[in-house]
């Protein structure tokens, strides 16, 4: 399942990249607003609470604090490729740390000073929650979807607010593979490009 999702994300990203690169050969259309971020490489960090949306079995839902450092590469005026870190501290009812990398991620966004975006990604996460019902091993795969808004400041930096849904599972490596689904609300800051 996760392999198919990852392949679909890779195929979508490569298709969008090809379309974007072919569109870059056309002369630029006149724009009423100046481009807020002329650079290609960016760094941002976001953090916020995460809540398990549906607990497996009869256990109490997990709550955590999530931090997401992100390195982005602007492919087009509306498309960013991203590599994200995933750091979480589960605080209740079980305490544990979680860390991982999301190397296949992208963000599609509008232009201008206020940018609405949709994001998706897939990666690998290691968790200290192994053994609770739904997560039977330490290594798990993560798939995530998000939507948010960013306000670009005059110097090119930005503040953002994003709601993100993510699913952790071992992709059937160890039954019963119920996984964990969490929703997080992230507040972020992007450095000027």
Residue map of PLM features:
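Short glycine/proline- and aromatic-enriched beta-strand/turn motifs that initiate or cap beta-hairpins
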Residues: 18-73, 87, 180-193
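Outer-envelope beta-barrel architecture signal
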Residues: 34-43, 77-81, 112-118, 155-159, ...
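Residues that define the transmembrane beta-barrel architecture of outer-membrane proteins
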Residues: 39, 61-67, 95-102, 114, ...
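Membrane-embedded beta-strand positions of outer-membrane beta-barrel proteins
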Residues: 43-47, 81-85, 118-122, 145-147, ...
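Transmembrane beta-strands of outer-membrane beta-barrel pores
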Residues: 47-53, 87-91, 122-128, 151, ...
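Extracellular loop and loop/strand-boundary signature of outer-membrane beta-barrel proteins
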Residues: 53-57, 89-93, 130-135, 170-176
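Gram-negative (and chloroplast) outer-membrane scaffold detector with strong preference
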Residues: 65-130, 190
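Predominantly the C-terminal beta-signal and adjacent terminal strand-loop region
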Residues: 148-193
């Amino acid at each position: 399942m996760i392999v198919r999702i990852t392949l679909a994300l890779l195929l979508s990203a490569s298709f969008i990249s090809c379309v974007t690169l072919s569109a870059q050969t056309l002369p630029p259309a006149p724009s009423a607003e100046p481009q807020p971020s002329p650079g290609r490489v960016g760094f941002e960090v976001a953090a916020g609470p995460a809540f398990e949306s549906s607990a497996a079995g009869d256990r109490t839902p997990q709550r955590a604090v999530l931090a997401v450092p992100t390195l982005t590469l602007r492919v087009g005026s509306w498309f960013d490729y991203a590599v994200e870190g995933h750091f979480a501290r589960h605080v209740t009812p079980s305490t544990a740390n979680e860390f991982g990398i999301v190397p296949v991620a992208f963000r599609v966004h509008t232009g201008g000073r206020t940018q609405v975006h949709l994001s998706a990604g897939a990666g690998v996460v290691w968790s200290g929650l192994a053994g609770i019902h739904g997560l039977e091993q330490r290594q798990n795969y993560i798939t995530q979807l998000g939507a948010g808004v960013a306000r670009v400041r005059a110097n090119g930096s930005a503040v953002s607010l994003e709601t993100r849904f993510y699913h952790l599972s071992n992709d059937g490596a160890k039954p019963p593979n119920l996984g964990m689904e969490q929703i997080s609300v992230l507040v972020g800051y992007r450095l000027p490009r």
